[in-house]
A protein has these predicted regions:
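A short, Lys/Arg-rich alpha-helix, primarily the initiator
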Residues: 1-28
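Short amphipathic recognition helices of helix-turn-helix/homeodomain-type DNA-binding modules
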Residues: 1-5, 60-98
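Hydrophobic protein-protein interaction segments
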Residues: 101-253
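Short alpha-helical DNA-recognition segment
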Residues: 28-49
């Protein structure tokens, strides 16, 4: 699946994904609008308008609904940014054709697995040598979603494959509308839907961490085969501004994990 051509800029109204997520979250919790109203302190009529996408929710209303529905921090931040998209946001950028040399020098100076990625399309735009060793095949020719679902090596590398892929697929479903062009979403959906787990991952909510302070994943060491517990960190550049994020995997700071990762 090629993803380097310029995308059609037909992006969904950013308020509709907010409406859809809140409605699905309420229904999954088994709450009526009246019951949610009692918990959130918002009238049922306003909840209905927000869920229909006919009323843009204020930050106060969103916060009240998030608290009442126990929305994970990962999705809270994204939905708040979507609510401001018509004033401050912009659609997902095209894949850059050239990465500045300074960015590549920084990337290659990191001894642990690191890559530059575009969110929320999971495009990989550059990798270092450690990334290539730990995640074979996950390079600029594919996306993280396609690699996880379609490349058999991902199931060997990711020791918590089901949990992590479920979270990524559901995150793509929630966070791409309103940001990523619909044509691009449809193409990624079609490419990944051949995986037998796709429907379950797409239609059911995963066990999302309540906080994001220590996202730990177990990765198989490429040489020894040992399980290495690593924290994934996503770094956004403020100066200079960049359209991509620096994604790194670092071993936990206990001696056994550090020694295994450094072998």
């Amino acid at each position: 699946l090629s993803h380097r051509t310029k995308e059609d800029r037909d992006v969904e109204d950013p308020h509709l994904p907010i409406a859809r997520y809140l409605r699905e979250r309420r229904e999954a919790a088994g709450l009526t609008r009246v019951a949610l109203s009692a918990q959130a302190g918002i009238s049922p009529a306003l909840i209905q308008k927000i869920e229909q996408g006919s009323r843009t929710p204020t930050l106060e209303a969103l916060t009240a609904l998030f608290d009442a529905l126990d929305v994970p921090a990962l999705f809270r931040d994204h939905l708040v940014s979507l609510s401001l998209a018509d004033r401050y946001g912009s659609p997902a950028a095209d894949i850059p054709s050239d990465i500045p040399t300074a960015d590549l020098v920084l990337l290659n100076s990191i001894s642990y697995p690191a890559s530059l990625q575009m969110y929320t399309t999971y495009d990989v735009v550059a990798t270092n040598s450690a990334w290539t060793r730990y995640f074979p095949g996950l390079d600029t020719s594919t996306t993280l979603l396609e690699w996880m679902l379609l490349d058999p090596r991902s199931r060997e590398v990711m020791l918590d494959w089901d949990k992590q892929v479920h979270l990524c697929v559901y995150g793509f479903r929630v966070m791409s509308p309103g940001v990523v062009p619909k044509e691009r979403i449809d193409r990624l959906f079609a490419a990944c839907a051949v995986a037998e787990e796709w429907e379950r991952f797409w239609t059911t909510e995963p066990d999302v961490p309540s906080h994001l302070d220590r996202p730990v994943q177990r990765i198989r060491h490429p040489e020894t085969g040992a399980a290495v517990a690593m924290t994934m960190q996503v770094h956004d550049s403020i100066v200079p501004r960049r359209e991509w994020s620096l994604v790194t995997f670092c071993p936990l700071l206990d001696g056994s994990s550090r020694d295994a990762a450094n072998q």
